[in-house]
């Protein structure tokens, strides 16, 4: 080892010494040898090191303009290795480039602690690096024969016992020593969090690095650190005795002193090649650097021998470990049975005795190669790699982790290949078959006398098959019966979020003091985005003139004097509400263990008469809970349910083209993609189908279920498994090919979003009109009636035809409107729901799994939600039951049987509904998601009819939207006039309908639309909002123009007329 102004500090007995010129260089493993030790103090199994490390070290150097090394007290601070090579540098100015060696002649010392003398160096930092030096019994004798230079530290000599007489003589002199030729004992390198252990890398007969198959003690070769190969050892010993030469060397290296507080390390290139004379070498496959990299380290490529560093003023310091990889984890003492001494930087760490053992610690995978640095650049600090937010990357990482979790085994690791797709295919087929049997047993037996007359043995055989699959299900369906007079814990304060909603929508603050004079910045080309949340600077009873005056300051002073722009934040969930709900349902649900304590039962209301359905308490109940299951409503209102069967629907419009989602059926308790990997991805392939063809497909599916029931009930116990496999194979073979789908997997066709428009389905719509007014899709006062356009599936009725295993992924309703889902049957559906106040946590979890919050393509893990304290409502919706999903409730649904569901949205005319929709508007704008409900247009249309003027909270929420949008139109008109843009009435230009959406962000554009088009409209024109940047491809050969739907005069008249009575 060599270095400039570096020294080796250690302790022997009670004596302390310092060896100047020592610093770590390269280390390598060598094979055991029975040769005579070539150097005094070496064991017979030890040989000099061949500098043939498999990884090119990054050399470091210390500038010449440095102070001399400091002296140290051996007190209460622990020292380690300070090196910027393979070992990370210890970031402490006092100990840079110093190697602490703890050696006691023939007797092991358990620990060593030191501290710097200087008071300015007391804040010694901890580090992860440490070097253990072991197995050199006669190190002191070797140093004596080498005439080493020692520096005594008498203040630390107190409790070590008898000293070696030979060594006492040595510490009284300060003779010279060429320390770069001194051979050190075995060195093992480790870190706190990740150990790099030389003992677990064994050089076999073919010189290939391998790892022992177990962690039992293995005799390993010793590691020596020197400056050359075997053929240079004699030269090394001769140089040690050359005191004059060493004295001159040391004086040259200490001419310039080190600074008191800082040492600058500089990397310099060092030749790092294999030794010709050594029997141990590295092949091209062992090295982690390319041939070109090796040439750059040895430009002339003259010799493969290690070239000792010159005695120039530049100091080179390198350390390497032979081919340490992630699979090389092991215990230091298992592989190195001889005495080892710990030297670390953590003063609180326990001492390490000679017979102590360590548990193997996995080694971190090596990252990217460090780029080569110049000699003047400081070393690049190691930093944690930035966490990528790319959804595809995150999704692949999650899938890989889930795949590795499936391969875990309690015993020793086994090499086996798992085809997850085959396992998933078998599990899917078995689960589907079990659900088919349940469907036939529970729902079809009433229509088929042959099924009812099954013998008991055949019935038991079917029940046994069903039971073996039900045992593996963790359904935990929870329902709690409630009455019309039930009072919820959050009655009048929906989910304890009223303060949150009011703060975002109806809060007024004092505007900031305006600066004097006009602003010198340029006038913006377009106004800022129209946001509906944040505190207002104007009160809700202001006039339109006050709004226009405040908005005029944007052009003159470049400030927004209407409202304060604040970034939207999700609500903070009130955990006390969860405790109150547990107490409310405690009598009915008592099996909530620690793991299931975050489960909430679904309140189920059973109605029997029409009076109960039309009572005020019925409406109050539905608008209080997050989600409510209603039983008996169809019978109480005498609704003709048979009109909603699939055959009847197909008769009304047989040629109707419907959307089909092709999915792989599976249990609702988990989720796998089509390749069998556990993840959150919902695999669906879209296609089209005529309604009459889909009706025939559903009939075929039901017939297959009947056939499976007959076959399994007739087979014996021995034939059961083979019969099931045959049925599953026949099902896959009989299915039609689906474009983009794996034909070896079982697929189902989910008929989704079948629009029941009144002109084709008048009979069905007449039955829906029997419901209470607040549940009707087109009721008076329903906010969605004022959207100005028909939004399919929102203010229209849709039907969903579901075979077994159909999935509706997790989602919130558009603009967080409430929704109604009526299960016509005959089968059941499984529902999952999460209350509104947890949408912030859900958004974060969804992003961590590589999905976007608003994309309906994921199936959340029930287990993960419960572990993170997110309440989950899970229940089973039976035939002819209606589920009312309140505003903002996050939910996902799966059919466990054949079902027909009828669904639509309702916009309840209350503050909670309007406020949550306003929050959703800004959230959609921030994340670039399309809001299907044009909320701003909806508010102005409702204001035209002077709705909700007598409801104080609804009035304030409405006026807040109107104030902001009126000011935005004023901003736009002012900027158009200032820049002299082309503008015209939308009716004159005849470009499009009134409700427009931005081409980029898909957000609603209120009143004024930006276009890039031609005079003759020969090219397609796209609308753009005020804040999106338009690409050049939409500007080329086109001109900019604006259209408006409402003049300022029209908006002012509506605004001033909307006042309380």
Swiss-Prot record:
List cofactor names only.
Fe(2+)
Q: Which InterPro entries match?
A: Corepressor-Demethylase, JmjC_dom, KDM6_GATAL_sf, KDM6A_B-like_C-hel
Top-level class of the enzyme under EC nomenclature: oxidoreductase
Annotated Polar residues bias: 271-287, 321-330
Q: Which residues form the JmjC domain?
A: 760-923
Could you list this entry's UniProt keywords, alphabetically sorted.
Chromatin regulator, Dioxygenase, Iron, Metal-binding, Nucleus, Oxidoreductase, Zinc
Q: Where is this region: Disordered?
A: 30-49, 256-417
Against Pfam families, the record matches this protein to: JmjC, KDM6_C-hel
* PROSITE patterns named in the record: JMJC (PS51184)
State what changing residue 998 to S does: Disruption of Y-to-PDA transdifferentiation
Q: What GO biological process terms does the UniProt entry carry, in alphabetical order?
A: regulation of gene expression; transdifferentiation
Binding positions for Zn(2+) per the UniProt entry: 998, 1001, 1025, 1028
Q: List cellular component terms (GO).
A: MLL3/4 complex; nucleus
Region labeled Required for nuclear localization — which residues? 369-417
Q: Which GO terms describe its molecular function?
A: chromatin DNA binding; histone H3K27me2/H3K27me3 demethylase activity; metal ion binding; RNA polymerase II cis-regulatory region sequence-specific DNA binding
Name the SUPFAM superfamilies for this protein. Clavaminate synthase-like (SSF51197)
Q: What is the documented disruption phenotype for this protein?
A: RNAi-mediated knockdown results in abnormal gonad migration with aberrant turns and positioning of the distal end as well as in disorganized accumulation of oocytes in the proximal gonad arm. RNAi-mediated knockdown also results in disruption of invariant Y-to-PDA transdifferentiation. RNAi-mediated knockdown suppresses mitochondrial stress response mediated longevity. RNAi-mediated knockdown reduces lifespan of floxuridine-treated animals.
Q: Which family does it belong to?
A: Belongs to the UTX family.
Q: Kindly provide the name given to this protein in its UniProt entry.
A: Lysine-specific demethylase jmjd-3.1
């Amino acid at each position: 080892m060599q270095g400039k102004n570096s020294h080796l500090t250690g302790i022997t007995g009670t004596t302390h010494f310092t060896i100047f010129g020592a610093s770590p260089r390269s280390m390598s493993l060598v094979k055991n040898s029975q040769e005579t030790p070539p150097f005094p103090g070496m064991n017979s199994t030890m040989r000099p090191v061949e500098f043939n490390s498999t990884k090119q070290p990054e050399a470091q150097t210390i500038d010449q303009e440095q102070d001399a090394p400091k002296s140290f007290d051996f007190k209460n601070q622990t020292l380690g290795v300070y090196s910027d090579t393979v070992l990370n540098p210890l970031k402490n100015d006092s100990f840079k480039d110093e190697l602490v060696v703890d050696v006691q002649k023939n007797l092991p010392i358990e620990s060593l602690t030191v501290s710097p003398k200087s008071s300015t160096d007391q804040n010694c930092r901890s580090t992860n690096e440490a070097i253990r030096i072991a197995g050199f019994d006669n190190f002191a004798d070797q140093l004596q024969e080498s005439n080493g230079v020692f520096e005594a530290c008498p203040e630390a000599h107190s409790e070590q016992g008898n000293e070696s007489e030979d060594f006492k003589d040595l510490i009284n002199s300060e003779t010279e020593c060429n320390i770069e030729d001194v051979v050190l004992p075995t060195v093992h390198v480790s870190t706190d969090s990740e150990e790099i252990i030389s003992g677990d890398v064994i050089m076999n007969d073919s010189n290939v690095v391998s790892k022992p198959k177990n962690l039992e003690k293995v005799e390993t070769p010793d590691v020596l650190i020197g400056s050359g190969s075997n053929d240079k050892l004699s030269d090394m010993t001769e140089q040690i005795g050359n005191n004059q030469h060493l004295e001159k060397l040391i004086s040259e290296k200490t001419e310039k002193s080190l600074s008191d507080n800082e040492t600058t390390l500089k990397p310099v290139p060092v030749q790092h090649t294999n030794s010709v004379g050594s029997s141990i070498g590295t092949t091209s496959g062992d090295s982690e650097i390319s041939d070109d990299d090796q040439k750059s380290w040895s430009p002339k490529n003259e010799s493969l021998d290690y070239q000792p560093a010159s005695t120039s003023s530049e100091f080179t310091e390198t350390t390497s470990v032979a081919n340490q990889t992630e699979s090389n984890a092991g215990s230091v003492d298992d592989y190195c049975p001889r005495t080892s001494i710990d030297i670390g930087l953590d003063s609180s760490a326990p001492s390490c005795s000679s017979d102590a053992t360590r548990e193997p610690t996995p080694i971190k995978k090596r990252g990217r190669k460090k780029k080569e640095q110049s000699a003047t650049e400081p070393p690049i600090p190691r930093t944690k790699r930035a966490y990528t937010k790319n959804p595809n990357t995150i999704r692949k990482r999650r899938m890989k982790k889930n795949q590795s979790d499936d391969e875990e085994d309690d015993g020793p690791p086994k090499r086996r290949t798992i085809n997850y797709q085959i396992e998933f295919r078998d599990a899917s087929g078995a689960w589907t078959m079990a659900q088919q049997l349940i469907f036939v047993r529970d729902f079809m037996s009433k229509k088929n006398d042959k099924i009812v007359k099954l013998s008991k043995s055949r019935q038991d055989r079917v029940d046994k098959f069903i039971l073996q699959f039900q045992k593996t299900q963790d359904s935990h369906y929870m329902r709690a019966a409630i009455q019309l007079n039930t009072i919820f814990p959050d009655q009048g304060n929906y989910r304890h979020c009223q303060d949150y909603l009011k703060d975002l929508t109806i809060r007024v603050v004092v505007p900031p003091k305006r600066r004097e004079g006009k602003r010198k910045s340029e006038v913006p080309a377009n106004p800022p985005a129209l946001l509906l949340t944040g505190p207002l600077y104007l009160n809700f009873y202001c006039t339109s003139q006050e709004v226009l005056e405040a908005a005029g300051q944007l052009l003159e002073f470049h400030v927004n004097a209407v409202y304060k722009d604040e970034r939207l934040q999700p609500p903070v969930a009130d955990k006390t509400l969860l405790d109150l709900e547990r107490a409310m349902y405690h009598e009915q649900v008592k099996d909530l263990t620690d793991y299931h304590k975050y489960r909430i039962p679904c309140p189920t209301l059973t109605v029997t008469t029409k009076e109960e359905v039309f009572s005020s308490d019925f409406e109050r109940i539905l608008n209080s809970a997050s989600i409510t299951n209603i039983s008996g409503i169809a019978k109480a209102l005498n609704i003709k349910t048979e009109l909603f069967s699939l055959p009847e629907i197909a008769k009304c419009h047989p040629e109707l083209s419907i959307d089909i989602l092709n999915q792989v059926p599976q249990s609702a308790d988990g989720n796998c993609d089509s390749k069998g990997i556990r993840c959150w991805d919902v695999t669906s392939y879209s296609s089209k189908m005529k309604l009459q063809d889909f009706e025939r497909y559903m009939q075929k599916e039901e017939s297959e279920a009947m056939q499976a029931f007959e076959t399994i009930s007739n087979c014996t116990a021995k034939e059961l498994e083979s019969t099931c496999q045959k049925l599953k194979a026949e099902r896959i073979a009989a299915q039609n090919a689906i474009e983009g789908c794996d034909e070896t997997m079982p697929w189902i066709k989910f008929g989704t979003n079948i629009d029941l428009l009144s002109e084709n389905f008048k009979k069905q719509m007449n039955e829906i009109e029997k419901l209470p007014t607040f549940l009707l899709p087109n009721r008076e006062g329903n906010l969605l009636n004022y959207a100005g356009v028909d939004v399919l599936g929102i203010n229209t009725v849709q039907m969903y035809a579901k075979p077994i295993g159909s999935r509706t992924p997790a989602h919130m309703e558009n603009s967080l409107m409430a929704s109604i889902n009526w299960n016509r049957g005959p089968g059941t559906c499984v529902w999952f729901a999460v209350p509104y106040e947890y949408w912030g946590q859900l958004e974060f979890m969804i992003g961590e799994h590589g999905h976007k919050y608003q994309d309906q393509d994921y199936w959340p893990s029930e287990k993960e939600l419960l572990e993170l304290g997110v309440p989950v409502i899970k229940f089973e919706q039976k035939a002819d039951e209606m589920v009312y999903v309140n505003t903002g409730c996050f939910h996902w649904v799966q059919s466990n049987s054949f079902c027909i569901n009828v669904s639509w949205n309702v916009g309840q005319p209350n503050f909670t509904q309007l406020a949550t929709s306003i929050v959703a508007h800004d959230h959609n704008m921030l994340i670039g998601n399309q809001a299907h409900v044009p909320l701003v247009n909806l508010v102005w249309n409702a204001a035209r009819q002077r709705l909700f003027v007598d409801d104080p909270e609804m009035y304030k929420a409405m006026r807040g939207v109107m104030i902001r949008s009126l000011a935005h139109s004023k901003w736009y008109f002012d900027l158009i006039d200032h820049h002299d843009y082309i503008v015209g009435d939308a009716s004159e230009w005849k470009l499009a309908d009134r409700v427009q959406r931005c081409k980029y962000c898909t957000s609603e554009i209120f009143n004024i639309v930006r276009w890039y088009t031609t005079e003759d409209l020969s090219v397609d024109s796209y609308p753009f909002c005020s804040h999106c940047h338009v690409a050049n491809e939409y500007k080329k050969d086109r001109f900019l123009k604006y259209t408006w739907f409402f003049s300022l005069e029209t908006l002012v008249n509506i605004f001033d007329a909307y006042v309380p009575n």
